[in-house]
Amino acid sequence: MKVTFFKMFIAACMLSSTSVVAQDFELTFQSVDPAGNPNFAIQQAWTERVKLMSGGRLSIELLPVGSVVEYNETQDAVGNGILDGHITDVSYFSGKDPAFGLIANPIGAWAAPDEMFRFINYGGGYELMNALEEPYGLHFIGATTTGLEGFVSKRPLDGVDDLKGLKVRAPEGLIQEVFAAAGAVPVNLPYSEVYTALDKGVIDAADSTVFSTNHQQGLHKVAEHPVYPGFHSMPLVEVSMNLDKWNALPSDLQEILTVSVRDFAQDAVAILSMNDLKTYAEATADPNITVHNWSAEERAKFRRIAMDQWAKVAARSDNAQNVYETLTS
């Protein structure tokens, strides 16, 4: 009888252990991009790889921008558990702390995506982002980027002087201040409203996304003077989730998420870069589109204007000062 009871006890323990190991997790993330956008497709491919890598134990439902909350409300939604996570431009939360704007797009800091990734993964950026996010109830998993973004304009732009008086859509934070310092008039709009705003003349130009996506979305039909390669922006796109839900994940699933985001980042940059090269050839063959390429001197002039704003932003909060010191050390 004692032997039978002991066997039953061992079996129960094994069953309990197995059920813990086999526990499934289902998460809901909201993207900053609309469905049908190339960025969104790349993000969806990442969620599919996560499910495959985890043997089906971790599933992520990815929703397009605006599905649950507005694009600039996802940080609160994730922190409060309304969403489990988000994939978004960090600069949208500059109103919470100017540090978000500085780390999101320190114009002039990165010449290529790999430089940003080195900073995030090995240069203190990961720790900085989590120090910024954790008070809001988020865990920063990792970063991706679109690479150097294109710039769409209804007016010819061949240098910094042409920015004067230009009504330009730009994200909140440092990038708006840089454009203002260059003489432009920044306008705060979500990406989903850029086409209509250009078409109706609400804005003259837009810091939008990469050249190929702008072209696919029809922006070059209403803004026939794009600047490419971009001179202005390489956004830090964060993949973050609710801190409590992150802590509830087993360590192997945490590692799958962390490593998979690094792969996702390389995937995004490579795919979008290839798309840009193909689309550039199409655009230059279109007689209705004039692609402008700024000289090295004009690009350097814009970078100097941008870097002058770093210290001003750094003075606005302790966190911003920490970001500034890490960037410049």
Residue ranges and their predicted role:
Residues 1-9:
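Bacterial N-terminal signal peptides that target proteins for export
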Residues 10-15:
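Hydrophobic helical h-region of N-terminal Sec-dependent signal peptides
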Residues 17-19:
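N-terminal signal peptide c-region/cleavage motif recognized by signal peptidases
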Residues 23-115, 124-127, 131-329:
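N-terminal secretory/targeting leader peptides
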